[in-house]
């Protein structure tokens, strides 16, 4: 009986930890993460204070923080080739990182670090030098900055069969030296690295290439981490939020279901299907059943996004900033529909897969610059600063904890729906106008469309909709309007 009780206690403790690792530890009524891809720490700190907090964002995913290899031309992917766990990159040093985390936490913006637990750098001719000046010989699996030697890695092999679990989890992903996470020593170095970030005040981690590591090894590592730092405003016994990169199209040997109990999982099917729909390759009417009926993970397990830093560079159905009208519609739907843990992308302009972030002649990352409307102008795209996107972050906050109701569609690519009696969204992806009375579910009054403008000094700078005593309002979205979406919520009532 004692053994059974002990086993049950351990089982419940493990379940409690994994459930806690699905909690993003957001402040109050905030619920959207933004990925400030390749931004400097000092710029993120300022963005938290001057833009993200006032606009109601909940957190920032930052690029990898630990020392990486220096690659010719400084492509973005060099950040994903670590050579030590020193906190020095082109985004800044440890002091600047710690300052950014503190300043963001102080205004209610949580920080989530993109971490590389699967591998170290790939092959490099001769001795490689990292962003902190550390030398390494990746071809010999020698990384003195950790230190790691060949005994800390799986034997070298290529992934040629993605249906072979051994190859997927023990061979080298695109030539990156594959760490052996079953080793006590390797585990200890990874836990030490993550715990240091927790000590500095981060709220959690995006785990790169999670499917290339055995779930039981990750479970051990996650379960060994410290609780979040209460000096940064986290409650006692709070666990780091974990979201794991697991690409699973439904026929993978290593599946997302192996990881979704350990933390949230990146729902790539969401990204692909939302892109397909808003590109016009699937009627929007079918989105009424969006979510698990589409084969997606349960809402609390799914990290959702229209695009990410990887798949925005691929061809196919995924939308990115280069199709702005469709991208804004898809993002509005993403943030309005009650499914998933939402993350929006903030990119820099690219012409090819390897384009580096905006940099000066000395290859230093440059700070974003803004025009009079607050949009970025010097190579940074900053989708999160597009009014149509940050306004929907406010919409998502306004409708939190409400259900989907009042669905309407025209049998094709015009849809609308309510979020309780707090918000209303309409979308027109047809080549003809949407013009009719629709149920907004809102209390009677005049509301500003937060897509086309804002509520300023009691007046709308864009469209407005008058809602009658029955909750109906006249909705017009022209086929040639600048935006194909309209959004109303209770915090934008005149």
Curated annotation (Swiss-Prot):
InterPro entries: A-amylase/branching_C (IPR006048), A-amylase_C (IPR031319), Alpha_amylase (IPR006046), Glyco_hydro_13_cat_dom (IPR006047), Glyco_hydro_b (IPR013780), Glycoside_hydrolase_SF (IPR017853)
Pyrrolidone carboxylic acid: residues carrying this PTM: 21
GO cellular-component term (any): extracellular region
Active site: 208, 245
Pfam family, one: Alpha-amylase_C
Record key words, sorted: Calcium, Carbohydrate metabolism, Chloride, Disulfide bond, Glycosidase, Hydrolase, Metal-binding, Pyrrolidone carboxylic acid, Secreted, Signal
Leader peptide range in chain numbering: 1-20
EC number: 3.2.1.1
Superkingdom field: Eukaryota
Cofactor needs: Ca(2+); chloride
Record-level Gene Ontology MF annotations: alpha-amylase activity; metal ion binding
Residues annotated as site: Transition state stabilizer: 310
Subunit comment: Monomer.
The protein's name: Alpha-amylase-related protein
Species this chain originates from: Drosophila punjabiensis
Lineage: Eukaryota, Metazoa, Ecdysozoa, Arthropoda, Hexapoda
Gene: Amyrel
